[in-house]
Amino acid sequence: MRSDWIAPRRGQANVTQMHYARQGVITEEMDFVARRENLPADLIRDEVARGRMIIPANINHTNLEPMAIGIASKCKVNANIGASPNASNIDEEVEKLKLAVKYGADTVMDLSTGGGNLDEIRTAIINASPVPIGTVPVYQALESVHGRIEKLSADDFLHVIEKHCEQGVDYQTIHAGLLIEHLPKVKSRITGIVSRGGGIIAQWMLYHHKQNPLYTHFRDIIEIFKRYDCSFSLGDSLRPGCLHDASDDAQLSELKTLGQLTRVAWEHDVQVMVEGPGHVPMDQIEFNVRKQMEECSEAPFYVLGPLVTDIAPGYDHITSAIGAAMAGWYGTAMLCYVTPKEHLGLPNAEDVRNGLIAYKIAAHAADIARHRPGARDRDDELSRARYAFDWNKQFDLSLDPERAREYHDETLPADIYKTAEFCSMCGPKHCPMQTKITEEDLTELEKFLEKDSALA
């Protein structure tokens, strides 16, 4: 779809959406996003120019259907997929991608660390994906030196980062905010460092006693991203991995650095979003969102959850969707889904489905709470169908029509029950929605009440 849009830009020194927006240009991607979001195109351009919105759209991802992440647009949901050395393969990951897109993922991150040739897995995912693809390049950098962290060099990181850009990756998690002086701050934590990428960088710094190479070479990464329009997703290496560690000095020190890096990238017209926690008690979620906006000059916030309790392994799609809905309400731009398998293992297709639906609910609830124009239209339409006992329309309007139909069919599978004025909960005689109050009923009631009032 984008080949003709991109052709005139190829070979230019800076092809980012932010670069064009700051020149006053409304790109085809911005216009496409405006129509998807039902917002004015000049508003999209202005938000991208300001840095409050990103359109992750690598020039080499030509089959992408552009979307926006930002405070002015709908709250988005990311799904993580990826093969591991112990489970999954390229075909399974492409199927997970298709399932994620089917159930509403706005972006997908390929977090593959094994299970085959990582370049082939990534290429297959990008070629099959109409949504933006994100990656964490430090995983492949480590794989390129056979897991020997001490052998990693800055050039190894930069080589992998550029390779991902060449393949068409739309945004990359860059763990540049973790500084060597931050490491002592994790001493008082229960769970230390829980970011895989952050853990790799921390081990590298501890071995070499040198500053984070992604930080010292940040401007080199900027130069790479400019040529492809790859967006930064600045990784929060020190995100809290449990409630005890939330909002601590380690997390907030890194956040301050992430804000500084955001502004450096903006100086070169490179798009940025900032990643956030994690595990956060409900009473600290608003603080975390407000603090990120303050430190990072309102760059879009992209949070993992957050989980609001640590005691529910197997149900962390629920514990985190609670926090995600609150974070979205307070202004988070994108929510990274958590599956029921979180902390326990690699998610399968059903886990992806359950995690995504939980997060589509959270994002939609946030849009309603933020009074986004039209956010509640679908809810109202489904409610009217429910009141009219239009079961098929209810199914069609559901976030997961297959699951809604499946549950109805468990007790009332026959077609005749798809027009019945009851379900198996109340049965045919006790459903309160059978009580239809007409205009005529209300008119008669008003007359009675007026008469009764006069007599009193």
Curated annotation (Swiss-Prot):
The keyword Lyase applies. It catalyses: 5-amino-1-(5-phospho-beta-D-ribosyl)imidazole + S-adenosyl-L-methionine = 4-amino-2-methyl-5-(phosphooxymethyl)pyrimidine + CO + 5'-deoxyadenosine + formate + L-methionine + 3 H(+). Pathway: Cofactor biosynthesis; thiamine diphosphate biosynthesis. InterPro entries: ThiC, ThiC/Bza_core_dom, ThiC/BzaA/B. Zn(2+) binds at H279, H343. GO terms for molecular function: 4 iron, 4 sulfur cluster binding; carbon-carbon lyase activity; zinc ion binding. It comes from the Bacteria. One of its GO terms (cellular component) is cytosol. [4Fe-4S] cluster binds at C423, C426, C431. Binds 1 [4Fe-4S] cluster per subunit. The cluster is coordinated with 3 cysteines and an exchangeable S-adenosyl-L-methionine. Substrate binds at N80, M109, Y139, H175, S195, R196, G197, D236, S237, L238, R239, E275, Y302. PANTHER family: PHOSPHOMETHYLPYRIMIDINE SYNTHASE, CHLOROPLASTIC (PTHR30557:SF1), THIAMINE BIOSYNTHESIS PROTEIN THIC (PTHR30557). Catalyzes the synthesis of the hydroxymethylpyrimidine phosphate (HMP-P) moiety of thiamine from aminoimidazole ribotide (AIR) in a radical S-adenosyl-L-methionine (SAM)-dependent reaction. This is Phosphomethylpyrimidine synthase.
